Amino acid sequence: MTNSPLSYKLIRRSAGNSYCQPSCEPTGRCARSCVHALLWRRTTTARHYSGHLRLAPRMYKRRRPDHMMKRNSPSYTGDHKT
């Protein structure tokens, strides 16, 4: 079932894309490259749009405890004062 409706829809939607070449769709090779380009583009766009929303909380969550520990640790305060 290579010609599933979902994949066909994706290929058809990306027909306007410069990377996609629907003319050589019959050959599996071109179709795969087209899908690959679409996926790559989607990931980049997703990163562009939700990069801050998705990455920021994770980074803060990972860093905040580290900062607090450093701030509360006596060695850090001592180094800072001296």
Swiss-Prot record:
Residues 60-82 are annotated as: Disordered. Completely overlaps YOR072W. This is Putative uncharacterized protein YOR072W-A. It comes from Saccharomyces cerevisiae (strain ATCC 204508 / S288c) (Baker's yeast). The lineage of its organism: Eukaryota, Fungi, Dikarya, Ascomycota, Saccharomycotina.
